[in-house]
């Protein structure tokens, strides 16, 4: 079994495997799973610092494993103007719910109350499963940013790791 205890800022070594995890699993400090290549892996990280999509883990035997996000049920609320978008972000933020924020779109776990609030302000709701990468919060420290560089709601990532 591979065992990973270390996150890397970057690597010049070859990333030989990956593991695809949903958001709830990425929040866990101890994960036992199977890599996308079929290897058993144990991930042992510090508590309170979720794994981020695009991060690289180094196993104790020197193998580099990339964290990938699994598409999961989400609601993506899409706005057509910035003022309305800001108002909805404000109201949903006051509910202390996990949100992923993009340009004129925000994403949250399916919740009919939150969907109704967004629709009340004229946002459309897209329920297509997607990778969920919520903001870490004002005091969250690590994470909270996307590695995507697109203005749309795509989850395409670039291939190098960042310091977190």
Stretches with model-predicted labels:
Residues 1-13, 109, 114-164:
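Helix-rich terminal scaffold detector
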Residues 1-25, 101-102:
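Extended boundary segments
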Residues 34-42, 46, 102-103:
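Short, structured beta-strand/loop micro-motifs enriched in basic residues and often containing a Trp
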Residues 42, 75, 105-109:
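A generic structural motif
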Residues 45, 51, 57-59:
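Short, well-ordered loop/turn sites that connect or cap secondary structure elements
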Residues 49-52, 65, 106, 124:
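Small-residue-biased structural context
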Residues 66-79:
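Short glycine-/aliphatic-rich beta-strand segments at the starts of folded cytosolic domains
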Residues 81-128:
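Conserved, well-structured core segments that form or line functional sites
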